[in-house]
């Protein structure tokens, strides 16, 4: 799994968790995170993806460690407290979703980072 794929999965998870929210800060965070607004690899607000990449660093991302990395990433987001979305995630459910996403055609599949 590359870092863009994990970023996309985090975005999907948060979008689903907060789909009915009226919290403007969460809505804005999700809007800025949107990895599908532009054709390139990144987010709607490039600074969000840059911060995420800085957090990832040289870390190797696997399906098995991706949930822990995702939990760590949402903890460093200063703009909106979105950590609750990852408090009670079933590890098997997360991994199943990752594998399903990775097995289908998706943006960023050919990104080596």
Positions of PLM-derived features:
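Disulfide-bonded cysteine-rich modules in secreted/extracellular proteins
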Residues: 2, 6-9, 61-73
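Short terminal alpha-helical segments
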Residues: 2-31
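Amphipathic alpha-helical interaction surfaces
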Residues: 12-20, 36-39, 54-62, 72-76
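Short, tandemly repeated low-complexity microdomains enriched for cysteine and small residues
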Residues: 21-34, 79-88
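Polar/charged alpha-helical tracts
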Residues: 28, 32, 54, 64, ...
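Short, charged early-sequence alpha-helical segments and their helix-coil boundaries
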Residues: 37-65, 96-113
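Amphipathic alpha-helical binding modules
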Residues: 69-113
């Amino acid at each position: 799994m590359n870092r863009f794929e994990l970023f996309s999965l985090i975005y999907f998870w948060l979008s689903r968790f907060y789909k009915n929210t009226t919290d403007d800060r969460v809505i804005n965070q999700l809007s800025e995170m949107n990895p599908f607004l532009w054709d390139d690899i990144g987010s709607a607000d490039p600074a969000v993806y840059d911060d995420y990449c800085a957090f990832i660093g040289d870390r190797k991302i696997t399906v098995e460690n991706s949930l822990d990395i995702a939990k760590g990433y949402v903890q460093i987001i200063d703009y909106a407290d979105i950590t609750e979305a990852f408090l009670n995630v079933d590890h098997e459910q997360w991994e199943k979703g990752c594998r399903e996403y990775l097995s289908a055609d998706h943006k960023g599949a050919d990104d080596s980072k």
